[in-house]
Each structure stands twice: as C-alpha cells, then as structure tokens.
Amino acid sequence: MIEADRIVTASSRDRDEQLDRAIRPLKLAEYIGQPVVREQMDLFIRAAKGRQEALDHTLIFGPPGLGKTTLANIIAEEMGVSIKSTSGPVLERPGDLAALLTNLEAGDVLFVDEIHRLSPIVEEVLYPAMEDFQLDIMIGEGPAARSIKLDLPPFTLVGATTRAGMLTNPLRDRFGIVQRLEFYSTEDLATIVRRSAGILGLPTEPEGAFEIARRARGTPRIANRLLRRVRDFAQVRGKGEITRQIADLALNMLDVDERGFDHQDRRLLLTLIEKFDGGPVGIDSLAAAISEERHTIEDVLEPYLIQQGYIMRTPRGRVVTRHAYLHFGLNLPKRMNEPPTPDLFEGDIV
C-alpha cells in the first residue's frame, strides 16, 4: 500500500498543491481554527512590526496537513515581507543554505519544511545565522582553507516539522516562538469546507459541509481533498450542489466511513478482532496477517487509530479497545464487560 494513494492521507500530494494554493488563506483574520496560535501570532507580529524588527525565529510543529505551510505564508504576508521556501532534505550542503541566506532582504522569511531532516553539517552553519545573523564560510581547501564571516540582514527562520522530538536541542533552543498545531474540531473543519467551496464557486449546504468535515480526520488538507471529490460526484450524479445526502453518497462510494476510516483502517481493526481476538498481538504477526510492511502500520495506519482510541500499544503488543467493537456493531468480548481488577495498593500512601 502506498500512503499517497489513500484519499484520507494527511501527506501532501503534488497534484493537490495548485488547488491548495488557490484556497489558502493569506491573513490571520482568514485563518480558521487554532485560536491560541492565532491570538499569539497576531500579538507577536504586531509587536515586531511596531518595533520595526524581524519576527523572532518560529518553529511550527504538529501532525501533517494541519496548516504549517499556510501559517508560514501568513506570517510573511502579515509582516509585509517576502518568503523563500525550501525543505530539510533539499539542503544537502552548507553552500545550498548559504545561497538562500545571502539572497534574503531585511525582515524576509526563510521557510524550511521538514526541518528535522537537516544534515548536521548544514545545521552547524545555521546556528550563527540564526543567533548572530552571520554566515561562516570556508574558502579554499586543505592547509590554505580559511573562514570568513558574512553579515546577514535580520531575517525570520520559520521551521516546520511533524517530529519535533527529532530536533537537536541546540536548534530547538534557537527558536524564540514555538507553536504546536492541534487537530481541528468538526465545526472548524466545516467552516473551512464552506470557505473553500465558496472560493471554488460550489454551492454547499451547511449540512453537506458538516458531513465532509466529520469524516476528514481533524485535518484541513483531507477536508479540502474530500470536498474536491464530492464536487465531482455532485456535478455528475447530482445538481452541482453539495447537500448532506450528496456528501454521504459520495463519501460512501469513496469508502470513507463516518469516522473517517477507509478500507485499510477497517481491515486492520477487523484483523485484530477476528484473527487475534482483539489482541494483544505483536507488530510483526499483525503485519504478516494483513500483508503490509511493519513501518506502514506504525507510520501510516496506527497513528490516527491510536489518537482516536481504537488501538492501544502495550508491552505485549497491539490491542483493540471497546470502541472498535462498537464501531462495527459487534458484541463486546466477556473480558471487556468484566469489572476492573481492584488495585491492591489502592488507598496506600506513597
């Protein structure tokens, strides 16, 4: 299974990029959801503009598809500066980073996606650039090599990552602003769907937008992708308007159920229930049972199911919860109906 083939994947697709840019908000006032992040960034941006300074270096982290790139572009737009974008894997050599840094104007934003994937040698060059706005460059080779320092204009580095824990401490400590993006509520996603539909000129009833939103796994990127597919269905099999019924029929045809699960999610859960009596089962046995690679289960299938409380990782292996049985309308096994074992140490003072 290739993750990019799943309609409910939160990973970015090249074919989504053009449409995503067309519906991407450019101002904080248009940015839906993430109220704490929005309020804080509004304050920080206003303060920096009032002092006529570059915004502090900003780290944005959270699951894929929640709007890290969008927020980086909004920061540049609100600050009234240009943004140059790259990603960690692209910056292979110090020269790659130096070329970007030396072309920045005062106050500009340098956006580095997947910043946790920077190579150590590039990261070392980035430290003085972030802290002192200086670039150390080695000229020549061997005994004749010498280091020269170039002054850089004050700039803002905006780093984005889905794995903040993989950042080195020295790099993490150089960010003055750190923002975590959370999964979106269904109500906020419905607002995003209605906004995107309006930009696309697509008549959409509130109930239709809500039906799409509740199956979007808390992720705007998925919500917008589902909207485009429901638009196709409404155009061919409906009257061009997205109603709750049209959205329901379209998403059922796409095999996305009311919890946002697709065939792969349901197959994993049912395998645990039917072949392993709900678990626990080791990851390698589970991978063999559904003919998938271990890393596919760990990195692609499990995270959302764990986040929603349908699977637990235990020292003995994977276990489904009562939510999985109820989702499929199955009777709970006897062990799930038994009262919990009393804590032998309950009441003891520790």
From Swiss-Prot:
Q: What name does this protein carry?
A: Holliday junction branch migration complex subunit RuvB
Q: What class of enzyme is it?
A: hydrolase
Keywords in alphabetical order: ATP-binding, Cytoplasm, DNA damage, DNA recombination, DNA repair, DNA-binding, Hydrolase, Nucleotide-binding
Which Gene Ontology cellular-component terms appear in the entry? cytoplasm; Holliday junction resolvase complex
Mind telling me which InterPro entries this protein's record contains?
AAA+_ATPase, AAA_lid_4, DNA_helicase_Holl-junc_RuvB, P-loop_NTPase, RuvB-like_N, RuvB_C, WH-like_DNA-bd_sf, WH_DNA-bd_sf
Organism of origin is Stutzerimonas stutzeri (strain A1501)
Instruction: Cite the residue spans of the region called Head domain (RuvB-H).
Output: 258-350
Q: Where does Mg(2+) bind?
A: T69
The UniProt annotation places ATP binding at I23, R24, G65, K68, T69, T70, E131, D132, F133, R174, Y184, R221
* GO aspect biological process, one term: DNA recombination
Stated EC number for the protein is 3.6.4.-
Q: What residue ranges carry the coiled-coil annotation?
A: none
- Xref: SMART domains: AAA (SM00382)
Binding partners and assembly: Homohexamer. Forms an RuvA(8)-RuvB(12)-Holliday junction (HJ) complex. HJ DNA is sandwiched between 2 RuvA tetramers; dsDNA enters through RuvA and exits via RuvB. An RuvB hexamer assembles on each DNA strand where it exits the tetramer. Each RuvB hexamer is contacted by two RuvA subunits (via domain III) on 2 adjacent RuvB subunits; this complex drives branch migration. In the full resolvosome a probable DNA-RuvA(4)-RuvB(12)-RuvC(2) complex forms which resolves the HJ.
Q: Where does DNA bind?
A: R294, R313, R318
Q: PANTHER family annotated for this entry? A: HOLLIDAY JUNCTION BRANCH MIGRATION COMPLEX SUBUNIT RUVB, PTHR42848
Give a short account of what the protein does: The RuvA-RuvB-RuvC complex processes Holliday junction (HJ) DNA during genetic recombination and DNA repair, while the RuvA-RuvB complex plays an important role in the rescue of blocked DNA replication forks via replication fork reversal (RFR). RuvA specifically binds to HJ cruciform DNA, conferring on it an open structure. The RuvB hexamer acts as an ATP-dependent pump, pulling dsDNA into and through the RuvAB complex. RuvB forms 2 homohexamers on either side of HJ DNA bound by 1 or 2 RuvA tetramers; 4 subunits per hexamer contact DNA at a time.
Query: Which Pfam families has this protein been placed in?
Result: AAA_lid_4 (PF17864), RuvB_C (PF05491), RuvB_N (PF05496)
Which chemical reaction does it catalyze?
A: ATP + H2O = ADP + phosphate + H(+)
Residue ranges of the region described as Small ATPAse domain (RuvB-S) = 185-255
Locate the region Large ATPase domain (RuvB-L).
4-184
Please report which protein family the annotation says this sequence is part of. Answer: Belongs to the RuvB family.
SUPFAM superfamilies named among the record's database cross-references = P-loop containing nucleoside triphosphate hydrolases, Winged helix' DNA-binding domain
- The answer on whether this UniProt entry bears the keyword Hydrolase reads yes
A molecular function (GO) term:
ATP binding
Record text about domains: Has 3 domains, the large (RuvB-L) and small ATPase (RuvB-S) domains and the C-terminal head (RuvB-H) domain. The head domain binds DNA, while the ATPase domains jointly bind ATP, ADP or are empty depending on the state of the subunit in the translocation cycle. During a single DNA translocation step the structure of each domain remains the same, but their relative positions change.
**Where in the cell?**
Cytoplasm
